[in-house]
Amino acid sequence: CVYLTDLVTESIINDTVKEEFIKEYLHEAGIKDKKQFEIIKSYFKNMPNRKMVEKMMEGLRKSDIGTQERNSLSDYLDNCYPFIIDPIPNLYFTRDPFSCIGNGVSINAMHTVTRRRETLFAKYIFKYNPIYKDTPVLFERDEKCSIEGGDILVLSKEVIAVGISERTEPEAIEILAKNVLESEIGFKKVIAIDIPKSRSFMHLDTVFTMVDKDKFTIHPNIRNDLKVLIIQLIDDKLSIKEENKSLQDVLKEQLHLDKITLIKCGGDS
């Protein structure tokens, strides 16, 4: 097994990278007080790299830095709250912060502030890890529009699908599509699927998932007349075409298959 903790630890290749990582992590964790910033930075710098990465993921308690001294106005408020830096429990869902697309990677811009720290770990893996540092990056985490991995599905060597969802914006899909199609990875088309914008349809893969080359699970409340758009490069320019066909027919055509099976699941199925 390969764990995220291992990959990040391997990416901290020297003390300079470690300090860069700590500073960026603390800024994104919302540590604004300069004295507290330096105390926590020193705490992390003196830890073994693996232990530091684990602590960053599990959150930093006030008791961890061993001081009850009140150095700022904020120290007098919310004194019962145990954490200085909150844990990152959603790291469990590793398909959201970054997505492998062919031999490239999308380091995603998360929709909610709560989850944005997660992609920092991916940034350092694909910037410094000896094995993965040369991986083509197809989307950067600091883009102003959001995209999450649960909306990105690789359907074949030439086609990917991306959900336009509550968490993934059309502007982000255009950026990703342009980078993917202009790269030498081999993809030729991006299928953008407009799904309902609600928590129960949070990502494309919660309601539509490929389980075989010609079989897909689909939530029964997903209509077959969803708005589907095909994005491709024509004469080096991004071309977007709306399909006036059912999702099933679009998949058959774009994946060059004679038959597509949609397996209803969830709800009363």
Which residue ranges define each predicted feature?
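The feature marks the mature, well-folded catalytic cores of soluble enzymes
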Residues: 1-269
